Swiss-Prot record:
CDD domains: TilS_N. This is tRNA(Ile)-lysidine synthase. InterPro entries: Lysidine-tRNA-synth_C, Rossmann-like_a/b/a_fold, TilS/TtcA_N, tRNA_Ile_lys_synt, tRNA_Ile_lys_synt_N, tRNA_Ile_lys_synt_subst-bd. One of its GO terms (molecular function) is tRNA(Ile)-lysidine synthase activity. GO terms for cellular component: cytoplasm. PANTHER family: TRNA(ILE)-LYSIDINE SYNTHASE-RELATED (PTHR43033:SF1). Its EC number is 6.3.4.19. SMART domains: TilS_C. Ligates lysine onto the cytidine present at position 34 of the AUA codon-specific tRNA(Ile) that contains the anticodon CAU, in an ATP-dependent manner. Cytidine is converted to lysidine, thus changing the amino acid specificity of the tRNA from methionine to isoleucine.
Amino acid sequence: MSDIFNQFQQQIYQQKILIAFSGGLDSTALLALCKKLQENRPHFQFRAIHIHHGLSPNADKWALHCENICRQFSIPLIVEKVRVDKSNGIEAGAREARYHAIANHLNIDEVLATAHHLNDQTETFLLALKRGSGVQGLSAMQKESVVFNLPIFRPLLQFTRAQLEDYVKSQKINWIEDESNEDNSYDRNFLRNIILPKMKTRWAHFDQAVYRAAQHCFEQTQLVNELLEDEFQKIFEKNDRTLSVKLFDRYSYIKQKALLRLWLARLQLAMPSQKQLEQLIRDVIFAKPDAIPQFKLANQVIRRYQQKLYLTADFADLTDVAVPLKISQTVPLPDGLGHISLREQSGCFVFSWRHYQVQLPPCKQPIEIRFAYSGKVKLHKNGVNQDIKKVWQNLNVPPWLRNRTPLIFYGDQLKSAVGFFKVFDC
Protein backbone atom coordinates (compact mmCIF):
# COMPACT_ATOMS: atom_id res chain seq x y z
CA MET A 1 0.00 0.00 0.00
CA SER A 2 3.00 2.30 0.42
CA ASP A 3 3.57 2.19 -3.37
CA ILE A 4 0.31 3.92 -4.21
CA PHE A 5 0.93 6.61 -1.60
CA ASN A 6 4.51 7.19 -2.77
CA GLN A 7 3.33 7.60 -6.36
CA PHE A 8 0.50 9.85 -5.22
CA GLN A 9 2.61 12.24 -3.16
CA GLN A 10 5.05 12.71 -6.04
CA GLN A 11 2.22 14.21 -8.10
CA ILE A 12 1.03 16.73 -5.52
CA TYR A 13 2.75 20.08 -5.76
CA GLN A 14 -0.21 22.27 -4.79
CA GLN A 15 -0.44 23.66 -1.26
CA LYS A 16 -4.24 23.93 -1.13
CA ILE A 17 -6.85 21.57 -2.57
CA LEU A 18 -10.63 21.30 -2.52
CA ILE A 19 -11.73 17.68 -2.99
CA ALA A 20 -14.96 16.85 -4.80
CA PHE A 21 -16.19 14.23 -2.32
CA SER A 22 -19.16 12.06 -3.26
CA GLY A 23 -18.57 9.45 -0.57
CA GLY A 24 -17.94 6.78 -3.20
CA LEU A 25 -14.84 4.62 -3.44
CA ASP A 26 -12.80 6.89 -5.71
CA SER A 27 -13.20 10.15 -3.81
CA THR A 28 -12.82 8.30 -0.49
CA ALA A 29 -9.44 7.05 -1.70
CA LEU A 30 -8.46 10.60 -2.67
CA LEU A 31 -9.58 11.89 0.73
CA ALA A 32 -7.58 9.22 2.58
CA LEU A 33 -4.46 9.81 0.48
CA CYS A 34 -4.64 13.56 1.09
CA LYS A 35 -5.06 12.98 4.82
CA LYS A 36 -1.93 10.85 4.92
CA LEU A 37 -0.07 13.41 2.81
CA GLN A 38 -1.02 16.12 5.29
CA GLU A 39 0.61 14.09 8.06
CA ASN A 40 3.86 14.15 6.07
CA ARG A 41 3.50 17.74 4.86
CA PRO A 42 2.08 19.96 7.62
CA HIS A 43 1.79 22.93 5.23
CA PHE A 44 -0.45 21.00 2.83
CA GLN A 45 -4.10 22.04 3.28
CA PHE A 46 -7.25 20.50 1.89
CA ARG A 47 -11.00 20.69 2.30
CA ALA A 48 -13.85 18.64 0.86
CA ILE A 49 -17.13 19.55 -0.78
CA HIS A 50 -20.12 17.25 -1.20
CA ILE A 51 -22.76 18.18 -3.77
CA HIS A 52 -26.26 17.03 -2.83
CA HIS A 53 -28.00 16.64 -6.20
CA GLY A 54 -31.24 15.34 -4.71
CA LEU A 55 -31.60 12.83 -7.55
CA SER A 56 -31.46 9.67 -5.44
CA PRO A 57 -33.72 8.68 -2.54
CA ASN A 58 -30.46 8.00 -0.71
CA ALA A 59 -29.04 11.50 -1.27
CA ASP A 60 -29.58 12.57 2.35
CA LYS A 61 -27.87 9.40 3.61
CA TRP A 62 -24.89 10.05 1.34
CA ALA A 63 -24.51 13.59 2.65
CA LEU A 64 -24.66 12.29 6.24
CA HIS A 65 -22.06 9.62 5.42
CA CYS A 66 -19.70 12.27 4.04
CA GLU A 67 -20.19 14.41 7.14
CA ASN A 68 -19.38 11.45 9.39
CA ILE A 69 -16.23 10.51 7.45
CA CYS A 70 -14.93 14.08 7.45
CA ARG A 71 -15.73 14.52 11.13
CA GLN A 72 -13.87 11.28 11.89
CA PHE A 73 -10.72 12.55 10.16
CA SER A 74 -11.12 16.25 11.11
CA ILE A 75 -11.49 17.34 7.50
CA PRO A 76 -13.44 20.56 6.78
CA LEU A 77 -16.50 19.72 4.67
CA ILE A 78 -19.00 21.81 2.72
CA VAL A 79 -22.35 20.22 1.84
CA GLU A 80 -24.12 22.08 -0.95
CA LYS A 81 -27.62 21.28 -2.22
CA VAL A 82 -28.30 22.02 -5.89
CA ARG A 83 -31.24 21.96 -8.25
CA VAL A 84 -30.59 20.04 -11.46
CA ASP A 85 -31.88 21.36 -14.78
CA LYS A 86 -32.84 18.19 -16.67
CA SER A 87 -33.69 19.89 -19.98
CA ASN A 88 -30.39 18.77 -21.56
CA GLY A 89 -30.33 15.40 -19.77
CA ILE A 90 -29.83 14.44 -16.14
CA GLU A 91 -26.08 13.77 -16.43
CA ALA A 92 -25.33 17.08 -18.17
CA GLY A 93 -27.60 19.01 -15.82
CA ALA A 94 -26.08 17.44 -12.71
CA ARG A 95 -22.56 18.13 -13.97
CA GLU A 96 -23.31 21.78 -14.68
CA ALA A 97 -25.06 22.29 -11.34
CA ARG A 98 -22.17 20.59 -9.54
CA TYR A 99 -19.47 22.77 -11.06
CA HIS A 100 -21.45 25.98 -10.59
CA ALA A 101 -21.91 25.14 -6.90
CA ILE A 102 -18.22 24.32 -6.48
CA ALA A 103 -17.28 27.62 -8.14
CA ASN A 104 -19.00 29.45 -5.30
CA HIS A 105 -16.71 27.81 -2.74
CA LEU A 106 -13.36 27.34 -4.50
CA ASN A 107 -10.86 29.86 -3.15
CA ILE A 108 -8.55 31.68 -5.53
CA ASP A 109 -5.50 29.87 -4.12
CA GLU A 110 -7.09 26.39 -4.35
CA VAL A 111 -7.49 23.84 -7.13
CA LEU A 112 -10.37 21.41 -7.38
CA ALA A 113 -9.20 17.80 -7.09
CA THR A 114 -11.38 15.08 -8.57
CA ALA A 115 -10.94 11.33 -8.17
CA HIS A 116 -11.05 10.26 -11.83
CA HIS A 117 -8.88 7.19 -12.31
CA LEU A 118 -7.49 5.01 -15.11
CA ASN A 119 -10.73 3.07 -15.64
CA ASP A 120 -12.64 6.35 -15.95
CA GLN A 121 -10.16 7.44 -18.61
CA THR A 122 -10.83 4.31 -20.65
CA GLU A 123 -14.58 4.86 -20.46
CA THR A 124 -14.25 8.52 -21.44
CA PHE A 125 -12.06 7.60 -24.42
CA LEU A 126 -14.49 4.93 -25.66
CA LEU A 127 -17.50 7.22 -25.24
CA ALA A 128 -15.70 9.85 -27.32
CA LEU A 129 -14.90 7.19 -29.91
CA LYS A 130 -18.55 6.17 -29.99
CA ARG A 131 -19.51 9.79 -30.72
CA GLY A 132 -17.02 9.93 -33.59
CA SER A 133 -14.79 12.49 -31.87
CA GLY A 134 -11.53 13.70 -33.36
CA VAL A 135 -8.16 13.81 -31.64
CA GLN A 136 -9.30 16.56 -29.27
CA GLY A 137 -12.21 14.49 -27.96
CA LEU A 138 -10.07 11.35 -27.86
CA SER A 139 -7.59 13.17 -25.63
CA ALA A 140 -10.13 12.29 -22.91
CA MET A 141 -9.12 13.67 -19.49
CA GLN A 142 -5.83 15.29 -18.61
CA LYS A 143 -4.15 15.47 -15.24
CA GLU A 144 -4.73 19.23 -15.21
CA SER A 145 -7.37 21.16 -17.10
CA VAL A 146 -9.94 23.92 -16.80
CA VAL A 147 -13.67 23.13 -16.68
CA PHE A 148 -16.32 25.86 -16.29
CA ASN A 149 -13.43 28.24 -15.54
CA LEU A 150 -12.34 26.04 -12.62
CA PRO A 151 -8.79 24.66 -12.35
CA ILE A 152 -9.16 20.88 -12.18
CA PHE A 153 -6.52 18.47 -10.89
CA ARG A 154 -6.84 14.68 -11.33
CA PRO A 155 -4.05 13.06 -9.31
CA LEU A 156 -5.48 9.51 -9.54
CA LEU A 157 -5.61 9.29 -13.32
CA GLN A 158 -2.90 6.64 -13.57
CA PHE A 159 -4.29 4.40 -10.80
CA THR A 160 -6.82 1.65 -11.42
CA ARG A 161 -10.03 1.32 -9.48
CA ALA A 162 -8.73 -1.96 -8.03
CA GLN A 163 -5.67 -0.16 -6.62
CA LEU A 164 -7.88 2.47 -5.01
CA GLU A 165 -10.18 -0.17 -3.53
CA ASP A 166 -7.23 -2.03 -2.01
CA TYR A 167 -5.95 1.19 -0.48
CA VAL A 168 -9.29 2.22 1.04
CA LYS A 169 -9.77 -1.27 2.48
CA SER A 170 -6.30 -1.13 4.01
CA GLN A 171 -7.30 2.11 5.75
CA LYS A 172 -10.53 0.46 6.98
CA ILE A 173 -12.76 3.25 5.63
CA ASN A 174 -16.29 2.61 4.42
CA TRP A 175 -17.65 4.07 1.22
CA ILE A 176 -21.08 4.30 -0.38
CA GLU A 177 -22.30 2.65 -3.56
CA ASP A 178 -24.52 4.69 -5.87
CA GLU A 179 -27.34 2.40 -6.98
CA SER A 180 -27.42 4.14 -10.37
CA ASN A 181 -24.00 2.62 -11.13
CA GLU A 182 -25.81 -0.65 -11.82
CA ASP A 183 -28.18 0.92 -14.35
CA ASN A 184 -26.80 -0.19 -17.71
CA SER A 185 -29.12 2.11 -19.63
CA TYR A 186 -26.39 4.71 -19.05
CA ASP A 187 -23.66 4.34 -21.66
CA ARG A 188 -20.83 4.64 -19.16
CA ASN A 189 -22.28 1.91 -16.95
CA PHE A 190 -22.84 -0.30 -19.99
CA LEU A 191 -19.15 -0.03 -20.82
CA ARG A 192 -18.04 -0.43 -17.20
CA ASN A 193 -20.25 -3.37 -16.27
CA ILE A 194 -20.57 -5.34 -19.51
CA ILE A 195 -18.12 -4.43 -22.27
CA LEU A 196 -14.83 -3.61 -20.53
CA PRO A 197 -14.69 -6.66 -18.22
CA LYS A 198 -14.84 -8.89 -21.32
CA MET A 199 -12.18 -6.87 -23.12
CA LYS A 200 -9.84 -7.05 -20.15
CA THR A 201 -10.09 -10.83 -19.94
CA ARG A 202 -8.42 -10.86 -23.36
CA TRP A 203 -6.25 -7.71 -23.06
CA ALA A 204 -5.23 -7.31 -19.43
CA HIS A 205 -3.47 -3.98 -19.99
CA PHE A 206 -6.18 -2.41 -22.13
CA ASP A 207 -6.61 0.55 -19.75
CA GLN A 208 -2.92 1.41 -19.93
CA ALA A 209 -2.98 1.19 -23.74
CA VAL A 210 -5.97 3.52 -23.91
CA TYR A 211 -4.22 5.95 -21.58
CA ARG A 212 -1.24 6.09 -23.95
CA ALA A 213 -3.53 6.54 -26.96
CA ALA A 214 -5.30 9.44 -25.23
CA GLN A 215 -1.93 11.05 -24.50
CA HIS A 216 -0.94 10.72 -28.17
CA CYS A 217 -4.20 12.41 -29.18
CA PHE A 218 -3.61 15.17 -26.65
CA GLU A 219 -0.12 15.81 -28.03
CA GLN A 220 -1.48 15.96 -31.58
CA THR A 221 -4.13 18.46 -30.47
CA GLN A 222 -1.51 20.59 -28.75
CA LEU A 223 0.69 20.51 -31.84
CA VAL A 224 -2.14 21.61 -34.15
CA ASN A 225 -3.05 24.43 -31.77
CA GLU A 226 0.58 25.52 -31.56
CA LEU A 227 0.88 25.64 -35.35
CA LEU A 228 -2.37 27.62 -35.62
CA GLU A 229 -1.63 30.09 -32.84
CA ASP A 230 -0.07 32.86 -34.95
CA GLU A 231 -2.96 32.79 -37.41
CA PHE A 232 -5.50 32.56 -34.61
CA GLN A 233 -4.13 35.65 -32.86
CA LYS A 234 -4.68 37.67 -36.05
CA ILE A 235 -8.43 36.99 -35.99
CA PHE A 236 -9.13 36.67 -32.25
CA GLU A 237 -10.14 39.82 -30.37
CA LYS A 238 -9.09 39.41 -26.74
CA ASN A 239 -11.19 42.27 -25.38
CA ASP A 240 -14.59 40.94 -26.41
CA ARG A 241 -13.42 37.36 -27.20
CA THR A 242 -14.86 37.54 -30.70
CA LEU A 243 -13.53 35.85 -33.84
CA SER A 244 -13.17 37.80 -37.07
CA VAL A 245 -14.42 35.82 -40.07
CA LYS A 246 -13.89 38.60 -42.61
CA LEU A 247 -11.17 36.65 -44.43
CA PHE A 248 -12.36 33.16 -43.53
CA ASP A 249 -12.91 32.22 -47.17
CA ARG A 250 -9.14 32.39 -47.70
CA TYR A 251 -8.60 29.38 -45.44
CA SER A 252 -9.03 25.76 -46.43
CA TYR A 253 -12.13 24.03 -45.08
CA ILE A 254 -9.96 21.96 -42.73
CA LYS A 255 -8.26 25.08 -41.39
CA GLN A 256 -11.61 26.84 -40.92
CA LYS A 257 -12.79 24.00 -38.70
CA ALA A 258 -9.52 23.89 -36.77
CA LEU A 259 -9.63 27.65 -36.08
CA LEU A 260 -13.24 27.39 -34.93
CA ARG A 261 -12.36 24.55 -32.57
CA LEU A 262 -9.50 26.59 -31.16
CA TRP A 263 -11.83 29.56 -30.60
CA LEU A 264 -14.44 27.39 -28.88
CA ALA A 265 -11.74 25.83 -26.71
CA ARG A 266 -10.56 29.31 -25.65
CA LEU A 267 -14.13 30.05 -24.65
CA GLN A 268 -14.16 26.74 -22.72
CA LEU A 269 -17.13 25.37 -24.63
CA ALA A 270 -17.82 21.70 -25.24
CA MET A 271 -16.76 20.78 -28.74
CA PRO A 272 -19.61 20.59 -31.26
CA SER A 273 -20.05 17.57 -33.46
CA GLN A 274 -18.66 17.52 -37.00
CA LYS A 275 -22.17 18.12 -38.33
CA GLN A 276 -22.68 21.11 -36.02
CA LEU A 277 -19.32 22.59 -37.00
CA GLU A 278 -20.17 22.29 -40.68
CA GLN A 279 -23.55 23.90 -40.03
CA LEU A 280 -21.89 26.77 -38.15
CA ILE A 281 -19.60 27.47 -41.11
CA ARG A 282 -22.34 27.16 -43.73
CA ASP A 283 -25.27 28.85 -41.99
CA VAL A 284 -23.55 31.47 -39.85
CA ILE A 285 -20.11 32.40 -41.14
CA PHE A 286 -21.09 32.27 -44.81
CA ALA A 287 -24.69 33.41 -44.46
CA LYS A 288 -25.79 36.35 -46.65
CA PRO A 289 -24.16 39.68 -45.69
CA ASP A 290 -27.47 41.23 -44.60
CA ALA A 291 -28.55 38.18 -42.57
CA ILE A 292 -28.57 38.00 -38.77
CA PRO A 293 -27.50 34.36 -38.39
CA GLN A 294 -27.20 32.50 -35.13
CA PHE A 295 -26.37 28.99 -34.02
CA LYS A 296 -27.43 27.48 -30.70
CA LEU A 297 -24.79 25.43 -28.90
CA ALA A 298 -25.96 23.89 -25.62
CA ASN A 299 -27.42 26.83 -23.65
CA GLN A 300 -25.48 29.50 -25.54
CA VAL A 301 -25.68 31.10 -28.97
CA ILE A 302 -23.02 31.93 -31.55
CA ARG A 303 -23.99 35.01 -33.57
CA ARG A 304 -22.41 36.87 -36.48
CA TYR A 305 -22.36 40.65 -36.63
CA GLN A 306 -20.14 42.88 -38.77
CA GLN A 307 -18.02 39.91 -39.84
CA LYS A 308 -17.34 38.77 -36.29
CA LEU A 309 -18.55 35.77 -34.31
CA TYR A 310 -19.91 36.49 -30.84
CA LEU A 311 -20.83 34.06 -28.08
CA THR A 312 -23.88 35.08 -26.04
CA ALA A 313 -26.42 33.57 -23.72
CA ASP A 314 -29.61 32.14 -25.21
CA PHE A 315 -31.67 35.24 -24.48
CA ALA A 316 -35.43 35.20 -23.98
CA ASP A 317 -37.70 36.86 -26.55
CA LEU A 318 -38.80 40.16 -24.98
CA THR A 319 -40.80 41.44 -27.97
CA ASP A 320 -44.14 41.49 -26.16
CA VAL A 321 -42.87 42.48 -22.72
CA ALA A 322 -44.16 45.72 -21.18
CA VAL A 323 -43.20 46.74 -17.63
CA PRO A 324 -45.27 49.55 -16.01
CA LEU A 325 -43.25 52.11 -14.05
CA LYS A 326 -44.36 54.87 -11.67
CA ILE A 327 -42.60 57.67 -9.82
CA SER A 328 -40.50 56.52 -6.82
CA GLN A 329 -40.62 52.92 -8.04
CA THR A 330 -37.86 50.41 -8.68
CA VAL A 331 -39.03 47.45 -10.74
CA PRO A 332 -37.30 44.27 -11.94
CA LEU A 333 -36.70 43.77 -15.65
CA PRO A 334 -36.98 40.34 -17.27
CA ASP A 335 -34.28 37.85 -18.23
CA GLY A 336 -31.61 39.03 -15.81
CA LEU A 337 -31.56 42.65 -16.98
CA GLY A 338 -31.54 44.02 -13.46
CA HIS A 339 -33.80 46.81 -12.16
CA ILE A 340 -34.91 50.19 -13.44
CA SER A 341 -36.04 53.04 -11.21
CA LEU A 342 -37.84 56.35 -11.67
CA ARG A 343 -37.64 59.40 -9.45
CA GLU A 344 -38.61 63.05 -9.83
CA GLN A 345 -35.79 65.55 -9.44
CA SER A 346 -35.66 69.30 -10.21
CA GLY A 347 -38.75 69.12 -12.38
CA CYS A 348 -37.47 66.16 -14.41
CA PHE A 349 -38.14 62.44 -14.47
CA VAL A 350 -34.86 60.60 -13.86
CA PHE A 351 -34.65 56.98 -15.00
CA SER A 352 -31.77 54.82 -13.69
CA TRP A 353 -30.70 51.48 -15.13
CA ARG A 354 -27.34 49.90 -14.34
CA HIS A 355 -24.85 52.79 -14.57
CA TYR A 356 -27.01 54.81 -16.97
CA GLN A 357 -29.29 57.72 -16.15
CA VAL A 358 -31.82 59.41 -18.44
CA GLN A 359 -33.52 62.73 -17.70
CA LEU A 360 -36.85 63.34 -19.43
CA PRO A 361 -39.64 65.89 -19.10
CA PRO A 362 -42.41 64.86 -16.69
CA CYS A 363 -45.64 63.49 -18.09
CA LYS A 364 -49.09 62.39 -16.97
CA GLN A 365 -49.34 59.48 -19.38
CA PRO A 366 -48.71 55.88 -18.27
CA ILE A 367 -45.01 55.02 -18.41
CA GLU A 368 -43.86 51.62 -19.66
CA ILE A 369 -40.55 49.93 -20.30
CA ARG A 370 -40.57 47.90 -23.49
CA PHE A 371 -37.94 46.16 -25.58
CA ALA A 372 -39.25 46.33 -29.14
CA TYR A 373 -40.02 49.21 -31.51
CA SER A 374 -40.07 49.25 -35.30
CA GLY A 375 -41.00 52.84 -36.17
CA LYS A 376 -39.06 55.99 -36.99
CA VAL A 377 -37.32 58.33 -34.56
CA LYS A 378 -35.84 61.83 -34.65
CA LEU A 379 -32.78 62.38 -32.50
CA HIS A 380 -31.97 66.06 -33.09
CA LYS A 381 -33.87 69.31 -33.59
CA ASN A 382 -32.67 69.63 -37.17
CA GLY A 383 -32.46 65.91 -37.75
CA VAL A 384 -34.64 63.77 -39.95
CA ASN A 385 -36.92 60.92 -39.01
CA GLN A 386 -34.93 57.72 -39.29
CA ASP A 387 -35.91 54.11 -39.09
CA ILE A 388 -34.82 52.91 -35.65
CA LYS A 389 -32.99 49.99 -37.27
CA LYS A 390 -30.75 52.54 -39.03
CA VAL A 391 -30.15 54.34 -35.73
CA TRP A 392 -29.03 51.11 -34.07
CA GLN A 393 -26.74 50.35 -37.00
CA ASN A 394 -25.15 53.81 -36.83
CA LEU A 395 -24.51 53.24 -33.12
CA ASN A 396 -22.92 49.82 -33.89
CA VAL A 397 -25.29 48.07 -31.49
CA PRO A 398 -25.59 44.33 -32.27
CA PRO A 399 -29.16 43.14 -33.02
CA TRP A 400 -29.43 40.95 -29.90
CA LEU A 401 -28.54 43.91 -27.63
CA ARG A 402 -31.11 46.16 -29.29
CA ASN A 403 -33.86 43.89 -28.01
CA ARG A 404 -32.38 43.89 -24.51
CA THR A 405 -32.16 47.66 -24.10
CA PRO A 406 -34.94 49.23 -21.99
CA LEU A 407 -37.08 51.54 -24.14
CA ILE A 408 -38.96 54.23 -22.20
CA PHE A 409 -42.47 54.89 -23.47
CA TYR A 410 -44.85 57.68 -22.47
CA GLY A 411 -48.09 56.10 -23.56
CA ASP A 412 -47.28 54.79 -27.05
CA GLN A 413 -44.57 57.39 -27.67
CA LEU A 414 -40.95 56.21 -27.53
CA LYS A 415 -38.88 58.68 -25.49
CA SER A 416 -35.51 57.00 -24.98
CA ALA A 417 -33.39 53.90 -25.41
CA VAL A 418 -31.59 53.88 -22.07
CA GLY A 419 -27.85 54.31 -22.49
CA PHE A 420 -28.04 55.09 -26.21
CA PHE A 421 -30.33 57.91 -27.29
CA LYS A 422 -33.25 60.20 -26.50
CA VAL A 423 -35.98 61.00 -28.99
CA PHE A 424 -36.34 64.68 -29.89
CA ASP A 425 -39.80 66.14 -29.28
CA CYS A 426 -41.04 68.55 -31.94
